[in-house]
From Swiss-Prot:
Present with 799 molecules/cell in log phase SD medium. Keywords: Acetylation, Cell projection, Cytoplasm. It comes from Saccharomyces cerevisiae (strain ATCC 204508 / S288c). This is Topoisomerase I damage affected protein 2. GO terms for biological process: negative regulation of actin filament polymerization; negative regulation of barbed-end actin filament capping.
């Protein structure tokens, strides 16, 4: 499976998990979706299933936080270096305690399925 994970700007220094572990958690969740023969990804929303798996894993890791996960899906079929004509902007704001709460952003590409997932995870200390 050809996947690339790219970490984007975010405030993850106070994360309940180390940054590398967050990436692994997301990658494993995505891979388990792709490997599960009982899930029909043509009829089920990949992003909704991915959010569910990620949140379940985060909740198992620490119950001291509330978690929010967001996935934006881009279909990148037909895009190449000469024809990369799309623009996407996403802003998010929150009111929180910066020493305990934070945000992590990353990009997950599945070139086999011509999709790109822009994933944001927020954690709020209870």
């Amino acid at each position: 499976m050809s996947m690339q994970i790219e970490i984007k700007d975010g405030r993850s220094d106070n994360s309940p998990l180390p940054e590398r572990k967050l990436v692994t958690l997301i990658q494993e969740s995505y891979d388990s979706l792709k490997d599960d023969n009982e899930i029909n990804l043509s009829t089920e929303s990949t992003s909704n299933l991915l959010i569910k798996l990620v949140l379940e894993k985060l909740e198992k890791h620490s119950s001291l936080y509330k978690y929010i996960a967001s996935v934006t899906t881009l279909n990148i079929e037909g895009l190449n270096e000469e024809n990369a004509n799309f623009s996407l902007k996403n802003d998010i704001g929150a009111s929180w305690e910066s020493k305990k709460d934070g945000i992590f952003n990353y990009k997950l590409e599945d070139k086999n399925n011509n999709e790109c997932y822009l994933i944001t995870i927020l954690w709020l200390h209870k």
